[in-house]
Amino acid sequence: GVPVTNLIAANSSFRVAMLFFAAVNVTAFVLTIFFIPSLPTMGTVPYGKQLGVLKKPAMLLSIVIVVFLNGAIFGFYSYISDFFGTITKINASTISLFLMFYGIANIVGNMIAGKILTVNAKLSTFVLPFVLAAAYIGLFLTGRLTAATAICIVVIGALAGINSNVNQYLITQAGPEAPEFSNGLYLTSANLGTTFGTFICGLFITAMDTRYALMGTFIFVAVGFVAILLKMGMEKSIITANEGGKNVEWKM
């Protein structure tokens, strides 16, 4: 939606772009009413039980992971059009095309995520920060080259889709007894990550230039990876304690 809207705005006017955006939203609303089935209710979960998931160390660490990994991706994404214009030096139409590549790759990433999480969720979570860091390093080093930037953006778009699924998995896995509340926590954590990531990346832009917004991304990826290590270490200690026949208070 965003790339197409940008393309329309670049070739016509802001008014036409907003009309297109409104038409898409109305269409989605109508399709939701007539084609999305009602889901059966599973009963109301008491508020105390829902809030209780916030006492779980696994949930708290999952929230930290989501905030920082999502901040890493969308903190930079907030400035990606400016990056294309000032660093890669491409015109508005090409920027819209690049954003469309990103969006399509994001959809592909969602499909990939479903498969890799089914095969090995823990390994997928562990590897994700490394691949993210490598993709952003590639963009930092080759951002002035149009073809190389296009390749990096496709990879980053796919990783953004994978990241969203991994993040939601981490939150819901940590709070299965309150699925609706956990889903709300995921959305809140993701939005917080976008807010903080945009702020930090913006500071680097103010101090240097748009290219160095990626430094904020590297920081967020690093902190997210540390949180992943802490969560995995905690899970391992709980498994070890359970195997030893000890009583464990933490629930994963």
Regions found by a protein language model. Name each.
Residues 122-167:
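C-terminal transmembrane helical hairpin of 12-TM major facilitator-type secondary transporters
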Residues 31-35, 218-252:
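Multi-pass alpha-helical transporter architecture, strongest
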